[in-house]
Amino acid sequence: MTLKEAMKSIKPASQALRRQAERRWDQVAKPLGSLGVLEEDIIRIAAASGSLAVSLHPRAIVVMCGDNGIVKEGVTQTGQEVTAIVAGNMAQGNSCVCLMARQAGADVIPVDVGMACRDAVPGVVNRKVAYGTKDFLEAPAMT
């Protein structure tokens, strides 16, 4: 199947299902709209999937890892070298977020989007756009 064929096969979201999902959430014992964006997203997923029984499986927590140049001003508890250590711990399943994710049945995916380290961290997805930000007291942090 080509991309064009795949795109043509996508049907518009069902407005009838959207209204049903909204009514369903309005009947839950909670203030109307109190779940904010989460509630809106579940309603949109129901309308797009064609089912009120929304399933969010598999679950994943994507952690974007990066370093800030302002660290050199001494405003943090640790230096930038700790970011790579924490990201590596996440990749091994040894971090607080990993413990919570296991309880929720979610995977943790650490992604290097701007860690200051030069070497790849095993198990961390490399999508680096820069080696950390600049110190914003000296220059724009990101350009």
Indicate where each model-derived feature is located.
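N-terminal loops that bind phosphate or other acidic moieties
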Residues: 1-143
